[in-house]
Amino acid sequence: MVIKKEMKTEYVKPLVYTDRVKRQIVVYAILSFIITFLLTKNLHNYLNLVGIISIYLPYLLIYLVAIITNPIENAIKKGFENEARDILKNDDNLIKIGITGSFGKTTTKNVVNDIISSKYLTLITPASYNTPMGITRTIREMYKPIYQVFICEMGADHVGEITYLMDFVKPKYGIVTSIGPQHLNAFGNLDNIIKEKMEEIERLPKDGVGIINLDNEYIANYKINNTCKVLSVGIENDKADFSAYDIKYSNAGTTFKVKLDGKAATFKTILLGSHNVTNILCGIALARELGLSKEEIIDGVANIKQVQHRLEIKKINGFTFIDNAFNSNPVGCKRSLEVLSMMNGKRVIVTPGLVDLGKEEANENYAFGAYMKDRADNVILVGEKNTEAIYRGLKDSGFDINNVKVVNSEKEAFNEVYTKYSVKDTILLENDLPDAFIH
């Protein structure tokens, strides 16, 4: 069976000894030598004690290594960061863009880059590099004076982190993609999340430009404490400065219209989902501020590349998969289902459910299950325990439970797909997937 061939392939990252690990190994070895020497020097007097200590010695050594090396590592880290700050500070002509949000950051970052790179030489934080060290590494290792724009993804799962990154990068342009209960445990409550994400706009300079998603209720209801220019985007939203309408989906992607210069402009993209239309609107709004013409923006949108594992269309063994395996969330999963509902053949969703939602996890998964009604024909749930709330949501919504299959592993899920469905069907993979598929 094809799935067995897929699952047999192993994708394991090779072990890499970083400079930090090497320093820790050296300290560990020195401490081991010293303690072993002291214990064995008078071994005959402390034989019983040596036996007891040897059991706990590895834990003691790890603790001591951390105590000794942490100040050194922090100093090195701070030095690297200061070097990155100086690089940004010394380039007065560099246009800096910050992008944050509970979800949609990475996709929006890539969308912005694809749209404006026809006019500007851009430096972009790779993958999901959105922490101080990730940003520092990007600047130190990839920056060159020829770059005209720095597009920086900014992540946060604790209060104060966006403030820190804004002080670090000092962008003139800021985008807040969306806000929701992501990392709720770390933030404590939703109000902290809202306030933290909106720091992206509130800490822009007075001549800066903020771009916000007006369809997000938390953003729309937030009173921004800044006098900088703020542009809004939305879908069929008359209050938004940039609004998309006449949206159509197919296996080839999405088409939609936006009014530019008072006239309707038609955009085509390979990306799927209304949330991706919102992400593109953010890119369109920013591109206008950066001086791109309507034609340049239309071409830029058409050239947007798919982002791996974010509603990415894949053809494997003749089957059509919609891969949304990366970091599914309460908003994104509903958008995925909306896309699935417009596809041909049987509409199948494979999911292990939503995670990292704190006390709201069960409620959000229940709502996720209920939302599948009329949007999916068949459901494959991976893991009985963690998908129990989804199952209840499906059942209570009136979904035909005979079309729900609960399996214990991703391998079983793929077996189900390849044996029960045909190449005419569409399979949505929502949230984490096995390495054999992802790679």
Show where each model-derived region lies:
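Conserved strand-to-helix beginnings and helix N-cap segments that scaffold or border functional pockets
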Residues: 136, 162, 187-190, 280, ...
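ATP-dependent carboxylate-amine ligase
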Residues: 1-70, 227, 285-294, 299-439
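Fold-independent oxyanion-binding glycine-rich loops
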Residues: 100-102, 126-127, 154-155, 178-179, ...
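Phosphate-binding loop of NTP-binding sites
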Residues: 1-27, 33-214, 218-228, 287, ...
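A polyampholytic, Gly/Pro-enriched intrinsically disordered region
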Residues: 145-150, 251-255, 422-434
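Acidic, Mg2+-coordinating active-site environments of NTP-dependent enzymes
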Residues: 176-321, 345, 370-378, 387-405
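Glycine-/small-residue-rich active-site loops that bind phosphorylated ligands and cofactors
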Residues: 104, 130, 157, 182, ...
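Short, surface-exposed amphipathic charged segments that create phosphate/polyanion-binding patches used
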Residues: 139-141, 190, 241-253, 414-426
